[in-house]
Amino acid sequence: MGFDLYGMKPEVDTPKPEWTKADPYIITEKEGVMQIDPQVKEEYDDFMKEQWKWRDENEGSYFRSNVWWWRPLWTFVCRVCDNVLTSEDYERGSSNDGYRISKTKTKRIASRLRKLIDSGYVKSYEKWYKREQGKLDEKDWDKNYPFSTAHVKEFERFCEKSGGFEIH
């Protein structure tokens, strides 16, 4: 399971690529499964590469994190933004059911994270987190949940430019 966050009104620098042709997916007769039509596969693959490039260039449009990375990040954000986010935000942000975090809140999250990054707090927290993880038994599931300053920085940029976001 992963968490896909979509900016609701992202600040964009370039136009978003759009697929203007018919639905590229077909259902195969033999297996009865959905796949990309072989006649448009190469063109659709190129389109998807452009989509990913656009997402990378427009930081507020999309943020993704697998469950292992998301949980420590979201827990950290909720702790350091406890006067910004509600307990409902914390609970619903731990699920990927389309919950929304407003533009006002995401701007405040970004501002707080930026201050904590610039002050060195996030780096110190990362060191503490890794030290505590190192004390865990190898069989402890919590050992599989990483945390990094780089991930916080990426999330801060997304929050700053997302215009609010939905969690899927």
Protein language model regions, located:
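Acidic (Asp/Glu-rich) sequence patches and key acidic residues
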Residues: 1-168
